[in-house]
C-alpha cells in the first residue's frame, strides 16, 4: 500500500547516500504527514473519492459488495470518519481542524550522523513546520536572503531547531504559534494552548456557522503536562484563556489571518481565487498542453459543450489519446482505439461508464473528430452526446449522469496527445497518439441562465451538506 511504497522510496534515497559516501554529512528530515488523518471520506467511507467530493455517496451495502477492491487500482478508496479519528489518537479531531493537534500534529525524525550524536532519543520541544527552512539554512551556515533578484523578501518567522540536536532538555526557542483553517483556530504560547473549534465537522463540506456563535467554545490546555489536550482548563484559569485569546488576535492581525473566513457562508465574502480564464468559454490546445490542472481548463460541467480536434493520420493508421481530462475514477477521453476507430469515453465516479464509438477506423490524411454534448440542464444531469467525424454524425448515446463539481482532487489533469495519469478509458497507461494533433478545442456552448445557475447553486449546496 501507500506506506510500503513510501518506505521503499525513502530507502532508495538513504541507500544512495550510503553508496555515495554522503550519508554522514547529510541532514535528513522526515516528516510523516502534512496534517491529521482525513475524515472527508464520510461516515461509511468511499470506494470512489471523486464521488463524495461531488456530494454523492455509495450505500454501505454496495461498499461491502466491493470491499475486495479497496487498496487496489480498481478504485480510489477513502477510509471512513471512525478510522480517521482512530488514526489521530490520542489527539482530538482530524484534518481541517487546526484548533486541535489531531488536525495538525505529525511525527518528525531527524538524522545527521556527523552532527547529531544523541541518536535514538526523543525531543519534546514545541516547533512548527515554519522552523524547517531556518534549520536547514543554519545547518548549512547560510543566512536568509534579504532580496532575491532584486526583490525584497518577507521576514522569516521560523527559528532553527539546531540547538536541540544534542540537548534533549534545552528550552524551546519557539515561544508562540497561531493556527487557523476554516475558522478553526488556536494559539500556542510558552507551554499553553487555547483552542476554538468553529463548528463544522470535516465530513460535511458546506454547513457554515457564524463566528462567535453558540457552537464556538474556547478551550485551554497546558500541553507541558497534557500532551493530548485531554483536560480543558478554561474554567480553572479564565485569565490565562483571556490572555491567549488576546494574543491570538494580535498574531492574527500581524499575519493577515483576519478577516476569518467560513467559506460555506455567503456572509464571509467571496474569497475564491480569481480564475485565470476569466469569462472565456472557448480555448484552443495543442500537444504542448499536458498536466494542465482542472481549474486552468475551460469548465464544461453542467453545460452543453463541444470537444473538437484536428488530426493527421499517417499511412498505416494511428491510435492513442487525442485529449482527456480526469482519471480512472472520473473524467472523459477522446481517442482512437487500437484499431484506429474514433472513440469517446465518459467516466462518472468509476461506476457509470459511457463509450461512444464510430464503426470505421480513420484512413490516412487529415480529419476532424468532434464530440457534441447537449446537456439536459441542472446539477450533474445527463444529456445526449454525438460523435462526429469530418462533419458527419457517426454515433450517439445518452450519458445519464455527469460529474458536477470536480473530476479529481488527486493530481489528475487535462492532457493533449497522451493520458499522463490513471487511464480515463479502457486503454493502456499513457497511450500516446501516434498521429499528428494540430488542435483541440474545448467550447462551452450553453449560456447558463438564471434558472440554470439557481439549480447549480442549489446542487452545490445540497452536495456539500450530505454527510453519508
Give residue ranges: language-model regions.
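Short, solvent-exposed loop/turn and secondary-structure capping segments
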Residues: 14, 25-27, 38-53, 119-120, ...
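Active-site rim elements
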Residues: 1, 93-97, 116-127, 144-152, ...
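C-terminal, low-complexity/hydrophilic appendages and adjacent surface loops
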Residues: 86-106, 179-234, 240, 333, ...
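Metal-dependent active-site segment of extracytoplasmic phospho-/sulfohydrolases and closely related
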Residues: 5-43, 69, 85, 90, ...
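Extracellular glycan-associated modules
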Residues: 259-468
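Substrate-binding rim/cap in mid-to-C-terminal beta-strand-loop elements of soluble/periplasmic
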Residues: 15, 50, 54-170, 216, ...
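Secretory-pathway/luminal and periplasmic proteins that interact with or process carbohydrate-rich
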Residues: 35-42, 167-174, 393-397
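Loop/turn elements at helix/coil->beta-strand transitions in domains of secreted/extracellular proteins
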Residues: 22-28, 172-174, 189-192, 240
Amino acid at each position: 500500500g501507500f506506506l510500503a511504497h513510501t518506505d521503499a522510496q525513502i530507502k532508495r534515497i538513504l541507500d544512495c547516500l550510503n553508496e555515495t559516501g554522503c550519508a554522514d554529512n547529510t541532514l535528513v528530515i522526515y516528516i510523516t504527514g502534512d496534517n491529521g488523518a482525513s475524515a472527508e471520506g464520510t461516515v461509511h467511507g468511499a470506494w470512489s473519492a471523486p464521488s463524495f467530493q461531488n456530494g454523492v455517496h455509495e450505500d454501505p451495502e454496495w461498499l461491502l459488495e466491493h470491499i475486495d477492491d479497496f487498496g487496489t487500482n480498481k478504485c480510489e478508496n477513502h477510509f471512513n470518519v471512525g478510522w480517521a479519528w482512530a488514526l489521530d489518537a490520542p489527539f482530538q479531531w482530524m484534518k481541517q481542524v487546526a484548533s486541535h493537534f489531531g488536525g495538525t500534529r505529525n511525527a518528525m525524525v531527524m538524522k545527521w550522523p556527523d552532527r547529531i550524536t544523541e541518536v535514538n532519543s526523543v525531543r519534546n520541544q514545541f516547533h512548527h513546520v515554519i522552523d524547517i527552512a531556518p534549520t536547514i539554512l543554519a545547518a548549512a551556515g547560510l543566512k536568509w536572503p534579504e532580496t532575491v533578484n532584486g526583490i525584497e523578501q518577507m521576514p522569516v518567522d521560523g527559528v532553527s531547531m539546531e540547538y536541540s540536536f544534542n540537548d534533549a532538555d534545552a528550552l524551546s526557542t519557539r515561544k508562540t504559534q497561531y493556527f487557523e483553517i476554516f475558522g478553526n483556530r488556536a494559539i500556542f504560547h510558552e507551554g499553553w494552548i487555547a483552542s476554538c473549534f468553529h463548528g463544522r465537522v470535516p465530513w460535511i463540506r458546506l454547513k457554515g456557522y457564524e463566528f462567535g456563535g453558540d457552537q464556538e467554545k474556547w478551550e485551554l490546555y497546558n500541553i507541558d503536562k497534557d500532551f493530548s489536550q485531554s483536560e480543558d482548563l478554561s474554567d480553572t484559569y479564565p485569565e490565562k484563556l483571556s490572555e491567549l485569546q488576546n494574543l491570538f488576535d494580535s498574531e492574527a492581525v500581524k499575519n493577515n489571518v483576519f478577516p476569518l473566513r467560513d467559506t460555506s457562508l455567503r456572509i464571509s465574502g467571496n474569497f475564491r481565487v480569481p480564475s485565470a480564464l476569466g469569462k472565456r468559454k472557448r480555448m484552443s490546445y495543442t500537444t504542448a498542453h499536458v498536466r494542465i490542472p482542472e481549474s486552468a481548463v475551460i469548465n464544461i460541467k453542467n453545460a452543453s459543450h463541444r470537444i473538437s480536434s484536428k488530426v493527421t493520420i499517417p499511412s498505416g493508421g494511428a491510435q492513442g489519446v487525442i485529449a482527456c481530462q480526469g482519471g480512472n475514477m472520473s473524467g472523459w477521453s477522446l481517442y482512437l482505439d487500437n484499431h484506429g476507430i474514433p472513440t469517446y469515453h465518459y467516466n462518472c465516479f468509476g461506476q457509470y461508464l459511457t463509450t461512444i464509438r464510430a464503426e470505421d477506423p480513420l484512413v490516412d490524411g487529415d480529419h476532424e473528430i468532434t464530440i457534441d454534448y447537449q446537456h439536459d440542464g441542472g446539477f450533474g444531469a445527463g444529456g445526449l452526446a454525438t460523435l462526429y467525424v469530418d462533419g458527419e454524425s457517426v454515433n450517439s448515446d445518452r450519458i445519464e449522469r455527469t460529474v458536477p463539481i470536480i473530476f479529481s482532487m488527486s493530481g489528475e489533469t487535462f492532457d493533449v496527445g497522451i493520458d499522463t495519469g490513471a487511464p480515463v478509458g479502457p486503454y493502456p497507461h499513457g497511450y500516446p497518439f501516434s498521429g499528428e494533433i494540430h488542435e483541440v478545442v474545448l467550447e462551452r456552448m450553453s449560456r447558463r441562465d438564471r434558472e440554470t445557475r439557481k439549480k447549480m447553486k442549489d446542487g452545490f449546496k445540497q452536495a456539500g451538506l450530505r454527510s453519508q
